[in-house]
């Protein structure tokens, strides 16, 4: 009898019984330990690592959805903030890093929404960017700070450009109104 059939039989018996016995729980623990030990011995081999990496890559490309993206990008940082808030230690660095993450994440969302309206679907790229950002939040704070500073710099350039363009547009509009008024009075 294979592990899979034992697993299925166990769950069938679990749904039939209201209160599973201690022996059935112990059997389930043994079954899970056997499955996990067989998986860890498989991935210790270099060929096993290559096969498991290819399987994960296949799963990544086949099952990447917006739900998974939102789960990764919003649930994990929210969960980290929950743990930081519940701990009694003062971790201002973690607060700052996670808030910086949300700032960068909002820019990723804004840019990707603009590109998706044009017709570029960037879901896989967004998932990869969010995973890299989560890595920088926990392990590479200087990278996160560098990305934040670059975004603030380009935002400043963008806002000044928009401001000057808007003021120039208002000036041209006022000139146009003046010429229309003059020709209307003639």
Curated annotation (Swiss-Prot):
Subcellular location: Membrane
Alphabetical UniProt keywords: Glycoprotein, Membrane, Transmembrane, Transmembrane helix
Span of the signal peptide: none
Membrane topology of this protein: Multi-pass membrane protein
Organism of derivation: Acanthamoeba polyphaga mimivirus
Full protein name: Uncharacterized protein L606
Predominant place of localization: membrane
GO cellular component: membrane
Coiled-coil residue windows: none
Glycosylation site residues: 34
Transmembrane segment boundaries: 47-67, 114-134, 144-164
Domain of life: Viruses
